Amino acid sequence: VLSRRQRQMCIRDRIKSNYQNFMIQKATELGVTKFLPIIFDRTVVRKINKERLEKIVIEASEQSNRMNVPSIENPQTLDGFLKKNSIDLIFTDINSNTIKVDKLKLTDKPVCIIIGPEGDFSEHERDKILSFKGVQSVKINENILRSETAVISAISIVNYVIN
């Protein structure tokens, strides 16, 4: 683990299985402690194969010599997630006003990175996320990235800022 600070990550409910497996594996290797699947407005498949994902995080934890295995939470709505979490929220949205990575400010709260759904966030979701206390909207690249690339990039940026 790169830091003792607890890190979390939000992922959308479902992407193609092999891409999701890769994303979960790499995020585990990079130190994510918890996966929080969110059901967005444009989520098509609302179920995850939790057993399969748990197997992936165990294998990735062993491969990277992690002492702890990340947990995989049950899918939840965006509203439910925002209401019950006290976090530093990093919103990776190419369409909103963003800060530069070097301006990212993190507190002692857990960090949660929101990576959007394939069809992008709805305006309603974007507004809801941007109104969350403690949210920081960060552009991680000039180009629109595939989800698995965005996850690796965003986690690497957070690891850099934390350490």
Task: Enumerate the predicted regions with their spans.
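Short, ordered loop/turn segments at secondary-structure junctions
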Residues: 40-43, 142
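S-adenosyl-L-methionine/SAH cofactor-binding core of RNA-modifying enzymes
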Residues: 46-117
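Short, glycine-rich nucleotide/cofactor-binding loops
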Residues: 12-21
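Structured adenosyl-cofactor binding patch, chiefly the S-adenosyl-L-methionine
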Residues: 123-163
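Residue-level signal for inorganic ion chemistry
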Residues: 27, 57, 141
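Single conserved hydrophobic/aromatic residue that forms the stacking wall/gate
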Residues: 1-11
